[in-house]
Protein backbone atom coordinates (compact mmCIF):
# COMPACT_ATOMS: atom_id res chain seq x y z
CA UNK A 1 0.00 0.00 0.00
CA UNK A 2 2.99 2.34 0.33
CA UNK A 3 4.28 2.04 -3.22
CA UNK A 4 3.75 4.90 -5.65
CA UNK A 5 1.35 4.40 -8.52
CA UNK A 6 2.36 4.80 -12.13
CA UNK A 7 1.51 8.07 -13.79
CA UNK A 8 -0.45 6.49 -16.65
CA UNK A 9 -3.05 4.91 -14.39
CA UNK A 10 -3.25 8.02 -12.23
CA UNK A 11 -3.89 10.15 -15.29
CA UNK A 12 -6.48 7.69 -16.57
CA UNK A 13 -8.45 7.80 -13.33
CA UNK A 14 -8.15 11.57 -13.25
CA UNK A 15 -9.72 11.63 -16.72
CA UNK A 16 -12.60 9.53 -15.39
CA UNK A 17 -13.11 11.98 -12.55
CA UNK A 18 -12.96 15.02 -14.81
CA UNK A 19 -15.35 13.36 -17.26
CA UNK A 20 -18.09 13.46 -14.68
CA UNK A 21 -17.17 17.03 -13.78
CA UNK A 22 -16.30 16.42 -10.16
CA UNK A 23 -12.54 16.36 -9.68
CA UNK A 24 -11.46 18.84 -7.03
CA UNK A 25 -14.86 20.52 -6.94
CA UNK A 26 -16.69 18.80 -4.12
CA UNK A 27 -19.39 20.80 -2.38
CA UNK A 28 -18.94 19.12 0.99
CA UNK A 29 -16.97 21.92 2.63
CA UNK A 30 -13.93 19.71 3.18
CA UNK A 31 -11.98 20.85 0.14
CA UNK A 32 -10.92 18.47 -2.58
CA UNK A 33 -8.88 15.95 -0.61
CA UNK A 34 -9.63 12.44 0.57
CA UNK A 35 -7.66 9.92 2.62
CA UNK A 36 -7.21 6.20 2.92
CA UNK A 37 -8.05 4.58 6.24
CA UNK A 38 -4.95 2.39 6.08
CA UNK A 39 -6.28 -0.68 7.89
CA UNK A 40 -7.05 -3.91 6.04
CA UNK A 41 -10.59 -5.11 6.76
CA UNK A 42 -10.60 -8.45 4.93
CA UNK A 43 -8.28 -11.09 3.51
CA UNK A 44 -9.07 -12.11 -0.07
CA UNK A 45 -7.55 -14.06 -2.93
CA UNK A 46 -7.89 -13.04 -6.59
CA UNK A 47 -8.13 -15.75 -9.23
CA UNK A 48 -9.40 -16.29 -12.77
CA UNK A 49 -12.77 -17.93 -13.41
CA UNK A 50 -13.01 -20.81 -15.88
CA UNK A 51 -16.08 -22.65 -17.19
CA UNK A 52 -16.88 -25.69 -15.09
CA UNK A 53 -16.77 -27.99 -18.10
CA UNK A 54 -13.34 -26.83 -19.27
CA UNK A 55 -10.86 -28.78 -17.16
CA UNK A 56 -8.22 -28.52 -19.89
CA UNK A 57 -8.22 -24.71 -19.82
CA UNK A 58 -8.20 -24.66 -16.01
CA UNK A 59 -5.12 -26.89 -16.01
CA UNK A 60 -3.42 -24.63 -18.56
CA UNK A 61 -4.26 -21.49 -16.56
CA UNK A 62 -2.89 -22.98 -13.35
CA UNK A 63 0.30 -24.04 -15.12
CA UNK A 64 0.67 -20.51 -16.51
CA UNK A 65 0.14 -18.90 -13.09
CA UNK A 66 2.76 -21.19 -11.57
CA UNK A 67 5.16 -20.31 -14.38
CA UNK A 68 4.77 -16.51 -14.13
CA UNK A 69 5.18 -16.69 -10.36
CA UNK A 70 8.34 -18.77 -10.68
CA UNK A 71 10.06 -16.89 -13.51
CA UNK A 72 9.41 -13.36 -12.23
CA UNK A 73 6.87 -12.37 -14.88
CA UNK A 74 4.14 -11.70 -12.32
CA UNK A 75 6.49 -9.57 -10.24
CA UNK A 76 7.49 -7.62 -13.34
CA UNK A 77 3.85 -6.95 -14.25
CA UNK A 78 3.05 -5.85 -10.71
CA UNK A 79 6.03 -3.48 -10.81
CA UNK A 80 4.45 -1.72 -13.79
CA UNK A 81 1.34 -0.86 -11.77
CA UNK A 82 2.59 -0.67 -8.18
CA UNK A 83 6.16 0.49 -8.76
CA UNK A 84 8.18 2.44 -11.31
CA UNK A 85 7.56 0.32 -14.40
CA UNK A 86 5.61 1.35 -17.49
CA UNK A 87 2.23 -0.31 -18.16
CA UNK A 88 1.83 -2.04 -21.51
CA UNK A 89 -1.44 -1.78 -23.40
CA UNK A 90 -3.39 -4.78 -24.64
CA UNK A 91 -5.62 -4.60 -27.71
CA UNK A 92 -8.49 -7.02 -28.19
CA UNK A 93 -8.85 -8.92 -31.42
CA UNK A 94 -12.22 -8.89 -33.15
CA UNK A 95 -14.38 -11.68 -31.83
CA UNK A 96 -14.91 -14.35 -34.47
CA UNK A 97 -12.07 -13.11 -36.68
CA UNK A 98 -10.43 -16.51 -36.26
CA UNK A 99 -11.34 -19.86 -34.77
CA UNK A 100 -8.34 -19.91 -32.44
CA UNK A 101 -9.30 -17.31 -29.86
CA UNK A 102 -9.20 -17.00 -26.08
CA UNK A 103 -12.26 -14.99 -25.08
CA UNK A 104 -11.80 -13.19 -21.78
CA UNK A 105 -14.56 -11.28 -20.03
CA UNK A 106 -13.73 -8.37 -17.72
CA UNK A 107 -15.06 -5.14 -16.26
CA UNK A 108 -12.57 -2.41 -17.13
CA UNK A 109 -13.50 -0.18 -14.19
CA UNK A 110 -11.05 -1.59 -11.66
CA UNK A 111 -7.61 -0.03 -12.00
CA UNK A 112 -4.90 -1.18 -11.59
CA UNK A 113 -6.20 -4.62 -12.56
CA UNK A 114 -8.28 -3.66 -15.59
CA UNK A 115 -9.04 -0.30 -17.16
CA UNK A 116 -9.20 1.27 -20.61
CA UNK A 117 -7.62 4.21 -22.35
CA UNK A 118 -9.40 4.59 -25.65
CA UNK A 119 -9.68 1.13 -27.16
CA UNK A 120 -6.62 -0.17 -25.33
CA UNK A 121 -6.80 -2.21 -22.15
CA UNK A 122 -4.31 -1.91 -19.31
CA UNK A 123 -3.89 -3.58 -15.95
CA UNK A 124 -2.37 -6.52 -14.13
CA UNK A 125 -5.13 -8.87 -15.26
CA UNK A 126 -5.01 -7.68 -18.86
CA UNK A 127 -1.26 -8.22 -19.18
CA UNK A 128 -1.58 -11.63 -17.53
CA UNK A 129 -4.30 -12.83 -19.90
CA UNK A 130 -2.34 -11.50 -22.90
CA UNK A 131 0.57 -13.64 -21.77
CA UNK A 132 -1.76 -16.59 -21.31
CA UNK A 133 -3.20 -16.20 -24.81
CA UNK A 134 0.31 -16.01 -26.26
CA UNK A 135 1.31 -19.10 -24.28
CA UNK A 136 -1.67 -20.99 -25.68
CA UNK A 137 -1.05 -19.71 -29.21
CA UNK A 138 -4.42 -18.00 -29.34
CA UNK A 139 -5.74 -14.57 -30.31
CA UNK A 140 -6.96 -12.62 -27.29
CA UNK A 141 -10.51 -11.27 -27.35
CA UNK A 142 -11.59 -9.07 -24.43
CA UNK A 143 -15.27 -8.52 -23.65
CA UNK A 144 -15.98 -5.55 -21.37
CA UNK A 145 -19.23 -6.04 -19.41
CA UNK A 146 -20.85 -4.98 -16.15
CA UNK A 147 -19.08 -6.52 -13.18
CA UNK A 148 -22.16 -8.38 -11.96
CA UNK A 149 -22.32 -10.35 -15.22
CA UNK A 150 -18.64 -11.31 -15.50
CA UNK A 151 -18.89 -14.82 -14.06
CA UNK A 152 -22.33 -15.45 -15.58
CA UNK A 153 -20.88 -14.79 -19.05
CA UNK A 154 -18.42 -17.62 -18.50
CA UNK A 155 -21.10 -19.85 -17.01
CA UNK A 156 -23.32 -19.25 -20.05
CA UNK A 157 -20.51 -20.04 -22.48
CA UNK A 158 -20.04 -16.54 -23.90
CA UNK A 159 -16.44 -16.38 -22.69
CA UNK A 160 -13.67 -18.82 -21.80
CA UNK A 161 -12.20 -16.95 -18.87
CA UNK A 162 -13.19 -14.29 -16.33
CA UNK A 163 -10.44 -11.85 -15.36
CA UNK A 164 -11.76 -8.97 -13.28
CA UNK A 165 -10.03 -8.82 -9.93
CA UNK A 166 -12.30 -11.65 -8.83
CA UNK A 167 -12.26 -12.61 -5.17
CA UNK A 168 -12.64 -16.35 -4.66
CA UNK A 169 -15.73 -17.29 -2.68
CA UNK A 170 -18.37 -20.02 -2.53
CA UNK A 171 -21.05 -17.92 -4.20
CA UNK A 172 -18.99 -17.41 -7.35
CA UNK A 173 -17.76 -20.99 -7.26
CA UNK A 174 -21.30 -22.05 -8.10
CA UNK A 175 -20.81 -20.40 -11.51
CA UNK A 176 -17.15 -21.00 -12.36
CA UNK A 177 -14.13 -22.99 -11.31
CA UNK A 178 -11.40 -20.75 -9.95
CA UNK A 179 -7.77 -20.99 -10.90
CA UNK A 180 -4.96 -20.85 -8.40
CA UNK A 181 -4.65 -17.43 -6.83
CA UNK A 182 -2.27 -14.80 -8.22
CA UNK A 183 -2.91 -11.87 -5.85
CA UNK A 184 -3.85 -11.27 -2.21
CA UNK A 185 -6.21 -8.34 -1.56
CA UNK A 186 -8.28 -6.71 1.17
CA UNK A 187 -10.96 -4.05 1.62
CA UNK A 188 -10.13 -0.49 2.69
CA UNK A 189 -12.18 2.59 3.49
CA UNK A 190 -11.77 5.99 1.84
CA UNK A 191 -12.87 9.09 3.78
CA UNK A 192 -12.85 12.84 3.31
CA UNK A 193 -9.59 14.34 4.51
CA UNK A 194 -11.15 16.15 7.48
CA UNK A 195 -13.15 13.14 8.68
CA UNK A 196 -11.99 12.09 12.16
CA UNK A 197 -14.24 9.10 12.88
CA UNK A 198 -11.49 6.52 12.37
CA UNK A 199 -8.49 8.54 13.60
CA UNK A 200 -8.00 6.43 16.73
CA UNK A 201 -8.39 3.08 14.97
CA UNK A 202 -5.44 0.71 14.99
CA UNK A 203 -7.03 -2.60 13.95
CA UNK A 204 -9.83 -3.94 11.77
CA UNK A 205 -11.84 -4.54 14.95
CA UNK A 206 -11.49 -0.84 15.81
CA UNK A 207 -12.78 0.17 12.38
CA UNK A 208 -15.68 -2.26 12.62
CA UNK A 209 -16.60 -0.87 16.04
CA UNK A 210 -16.90 2.59 14.50
CA UNK A 211 -18.90 1.25 11.55
CA UNK A 212 -21.21 -0.53 13.99
CA UNK A 213 -21.86 2.77 15.76
CA UNK A 214 -23.27 4.34 12.59
CA UNK A 215 -26.95 4.20 11.70
CA UNK A 216 -28.76 4.34 8.37
CA UNK A 217 -28.04 8.05 8.00
CA UNK A 218 -24.44 7.12 7.14
CA UNK A 219 -24.13 6.15 3.48
CA UNK A 220 -21.21 4.08 2.24
CA UNK A 221 -20.51 3.60 -1.45
CA UNK A 222 -19.00 0.62 -3.25
CA UNK A 223 -18.69 -0.88 -6.70
CA UNK A 224 -21.82 -2.99 -7.13
CA UNK A 225 -21.54 -6.76 -6.63
CA UNK A 226 -17.99 -6.56 -5.27
CA UNK A 227 -16.71 -7.71 -1.88
CA UNK A 228 -17.16 -4.18 -0.54
CA UNK A 229 -20.91 -4.40 -1.07
CA UNK A 230 -21.19 -7.71 0.76
CA UNK A 231 -18.97 -6.48 3.60
CA UNK A 232 -21.18 -3.43 4.19
CA UNK A 233 -24.64 -4.89 3.57
CA UNK A 234 -23.96 -8.40 4.87
CA UNK A 235 -23.98 -11.70 3.01
CA UNK A 236 -24.00 -15.17 4.55
CA UNK A 237 -22.22 -16.73 1.56
CA UNK A 238 -19.34 -14.32 2.08
CA UNK A 239 -19.38 -14.65 5.86
CA UNK A 240 -20.16 -10.97 6.45
CA UNK A 241 -22.73 -9.77 9.00
CA UNK A 242 -22.95 -6.26 7.56
CA UNK A 243 -23.63 -2.97 9.32
CA UNK A 244 -26.62 -0.74 9.98
CA UNK A 245 -25.51 1.88 7.47
CA UNK A 246 -27.06 2.59 4.08
CA UNK A 247 -25.11 1.07 1.21
CA UNK A 248 -25.03 2.61 -2.25
CA UNK A 249 -23.76 0.82 -5.35
CA UNK A 250 -21.89 2.35 -8.29
CA UNK A 251 -20.55 1.14 -11.62
CA UNK A 252 -17.03 1.88 -10.40
CA UNK A 253 -15.16 2.89 -7.27
CA UNK A 254 -14.11 6.12 -8.98
CA UNK A 255 -17.75 7.18 -9.32
CA UNK A 256 -18.32 6.42 -5.65
CA UNK A 257 -15.31 8.58 -4.83
CA UNK A 258 -16.59 11.59 -6.72
CA UNK A 259 -20.04 11.19 -5.17
CA UNK A 260 -18.36 11.34 -1.77
CA UNK A 261 -16.61 14.54 -2.86
CA UNK A 262 -20.03 15.95 -3.71
CA UNK A 263 -21.28 15.18 -0.22
CA UNK A 264 -23.76 12.51 -1.26
CA UNK A 265 -22.15 9.65 0.67
CA UNK A 266 -19.89 9.52 3.72
CA UNK A 267 -17.34 6.84 2.78
CA UNK A 268 -16.23 4.48 0.03
CA UNK A 269 -15.11 0.88 0.51
CA UNK A 270 -13.12 -0.90 -2.16
CA UNK A 271 -10.17 -3.24 -2.66
CA UNK A 272 -6.77 -1.99 -1.53
CA UNK A 273 -5.08 -1.23 -4.84
CA UNK A 274 -8.05 0.58 -6.46
CA UNK A 275 -8.51 2.49 -3.19
CA UNK A 276 -4.98 3.85 -3.39
CA UNK A 277 -5.38 4.75 -7.05
CA UNK A 278 -8.61 6.62 -6.36
CA UNK A 279 -7.16 8.53 -3.40
CA UNK A 280 -4.02 9.52 -5.28
CA UNK A 281 -5.97 10.52 -8.39
CA UNK A 282 -8.39 12.72 -6.46
CA UNK A 283 -5.55 14.27 -4.47
CA UNK A 284 -3.53 14.94 -7.62
CA UNK A 285 -0.57 12.71 -6.79
Predicted regions, residues:
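Extracytoplasmic small-molecule ligand-binding "clamshell" domains
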Residues: 56-84, 96-166, 174, 249
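A ligand-binding cleft/hinge motif common to bilobed small-molecule-binding domains
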Residues: 27-42, 148-152, 165-175, 230-238, ...
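Extended ligand-binding regions for polar small-molecule ligands
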Residues: 40-85, 126-135, 192-208, 214-215, ...
Amino acid sequence: MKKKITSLVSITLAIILVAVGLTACGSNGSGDKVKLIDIALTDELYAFGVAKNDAELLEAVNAYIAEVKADGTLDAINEKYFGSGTPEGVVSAEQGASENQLIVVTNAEFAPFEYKKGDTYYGVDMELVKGLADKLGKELVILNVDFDSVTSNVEAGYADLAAAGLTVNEKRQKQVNFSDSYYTASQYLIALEDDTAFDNCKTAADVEAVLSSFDSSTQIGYQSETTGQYYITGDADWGFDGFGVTGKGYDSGALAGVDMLNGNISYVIIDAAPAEFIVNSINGK
